[in-house]
Regions:
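Glycine-rich phosphate/pyrophosphate-binding loop at beta-loop-alpha junctions
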Residues: 1-67, 128-144
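Active-site-adjacent helical/loop segments in soluble small-molecule enzymes
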Residues: 62-122
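Generic beta-sheet signal
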Residues: 123-127
Length: 144
């Protein structure tokens, strides 16, 4: 799981997954775009990279590997809500990990909901913190 916006992180992760035939799911939690728009951007980047490297992978495999969930966008890009702020607060207090409402905090809150809604239990889960630390300081006023 990770925050997906422009799609480049997701495209890179999926390229690695496809090239090395890794069966694990890579789920991008959209922080701004609806799935249909973001999905095509990611697919285009994957196709471009694989073509440049002369690696042949079926369109069907590529399409099956791009998982974007846009259910947790919330009020919009760069806008948090109390649930996202609570997630940021908990991660900072309990784990010492700063997050922001635009990217990582929103995606982490979305991941928690995704896991619960999809009944994922007793599984190893990886969340990739892709940055956004400077934006964390914008959230300080909400972390009291």
């Amino acid at each position: 799981f990770f925050a997906t916006g422009t799609g480049t992180t997701q495209a890179g992760l999926v390229c690695g997954q496809l090239i090395y035939k890794d069966p694990r799911k890579i789920v991008g939690i959209s922080i701004a775009r609806a799935n249909h728009g973001g999905r095509q951007v990611v697919l285009d980047s994957i196709q471009e990279y694989l073509a440049e490297k002369k690696i042949v992978i079926s369109n069907e495999c590529m399409e099956a590997s791009v998982m974007i969930d846009d259910s947790y966008i919330g009020p919009g890009y760069g806008q948090g809500n109390e649930e996202i702020r609570q997630t940021i607060r908990e991660m900072l207090i309990h784990n010492g990990i700063p997050m922001d409402a635009t990217y990582t905090g929103k995606a982490y809150a979305g991941m928690k909901k995704y896991i619960k809604e999809h009944g994922i239990y007793n599984a190893n889960i990886l969340f990739i913190h892709t940055g956004g630390v400077p934006l964390f300081f914008d959230e300080l006023r909400f972390l009291k």
